[in-house]
Amino acid sequence: NKDYITKHNRFSPPGVEWLYLAIGDPCVAETCALKECRAEAGELFGLCQFKLNEDYSEKTLVDLTIAEDVLYEDLNRQLENSADEIRKREVKKAVDGIMRKGYAKTPDVSDIKEKFTRWAAYTYARLLSKQIFVPVETEDKELMYSPFQCMAQYFLSLGYAGIIYSSTVFSEGKNVVLFDKDAATPMGKIKKINV
């Protein structure tokens, strides 16, 4: 109901109906959901679990949490080591080719593309997750959220179904925003919680 989506959310502007859920261990997800709602003492909340609909089981989510425990130095070292291994391998093949046939074949560096893509994806995800996803402290949510909203629209345009991201208000929590609010349905009973 568009009457209830009148405020900016991290990934969606007013009027856009996307589904925001806390994910992971049920106890952690419950705590995360309450913190995301900015629950205050005396408020009553209803929480339930959701299940991804079968139509969406093959859809791909962008996971911005994939590299949270990886250091930039480790990512760079892995890429450098891979490049060194490939260089040594291709130089050896070239020398062997020249010795046997008098010429060297064009080097095969196709596997560096996979290594570089992984490095770029992890570096980008870590950058977004660790340095950008901080709680918004300003009242101007439109200004603070607009980069995230543009990014979400970009991922949507590429065919992704949503984004997994770390909670900014609960360090142990993870959330998902699904670009189709009907991608998941409630299951089980609604648990009433008096904060």
Listing of model-derived features with the role each one plays in the protein:
Residues 24-28, 146:
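Conserved active-site and cofactor/substrate-binding residues in soluble primary-metabolism enzymes
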Residues 17-24:
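Short, well-ordered beta-strand elements within core beta-sheets of diverse protein domains
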Residues 29-40:
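Short active-site loop/helix that positions an aromatic residue
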